[in-house]
Amino acid sequence: MFLSALFVSLFTFVQFNCENLFDCQHDSLKNDVEFLPDGSYHWTPFRYWRKLNRVGQTIVSCGERNGEVETLAEQDCSISEEAVANWHLPDMVTLCEVENDSVMRDLTKRSLLRTARYEYVVTHSPDERGIDVALMYSPFSFRLINSRAVRIAPIRGMSPTRDLLYASGLIISGDTLHVIVAHLPSRRGGEQHSRPFRRVVAEKICAIADSVRAVSADAKIIVAGDFNDYTTSESVRMVCASGFTDVSAKAVGQNGARATYKYRGEWRSLDHILVSTSMMPDVRSCRVHDARFLLVEDEKYGGVQPRRNYLGPRWRDGFSDHLPLVAEFALDE
């Protein structure tokens, strides 16, 4: 009786702004000259591959929490087949600030993540810098059915921005999971000036969710990404008002991080994971992943801060200026 309820699978979901994951090749249609070997960041093949493996290390460490996993994640080595079989690596990762398909192919097929067998989908946005969003997933826990990029029509004064990424697929419970990946416009020009630009994207997110629910009223939907806004900001409140809960609203780390991003000594929650009402019973936890090797001492303001890749023009051989969010879901098999 109710035998299926006895078998529960842990589904680990990660949201990560990986900070300027560019390749070293010039795209004549994009403003990516800073991230070339002769650009202001001196973005060489060595630094590119170092960055890829840093992103891989971060993702590995977001999986099953034990000392052995974190020890491996600190090392620049590939993941063995045995490790893949015995460790619970993240099932799904949403990524912000990746340049293109080539970068995602290198990350999943040639970096230290290659034996994890992740698959991915990525957008090709009109963003002037050429940065996109991507969804990376394990084919063993998510079977992709459909994916598409959703273009945002700019309003007056708004530069072309990142596409939304919509994907759907089957999870271990047999349900269809719908995912919307977003990277909303920055606060360049000031919060008030740029607020309407983020509102436009939030409206599009709500429209996508409404179209999904028109077909399946109790659809399981996750919205994740860098909103460049807080839980109390208009864009996040708009999405929550359309039937979502910000499960990352109170997420903190275990090693001093109070949010995913730190600016002038203040921790700020710009990254969010929002879950549809129908999926809330599946939520087990949500945390900021602040493994010690992802942090450095904040010498100016005290405490710790993310170990970013660049500080101004100086390469710091770090990871990202954002920390990942990790949400865990308990799914009936």
Residues covered by each model-derived region:
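N-terminal, active-site-proximal structural segment of metallo-dependent hydrolase catalytic domains
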Residues: 8-113, 117-133, 202-203, 297, ...
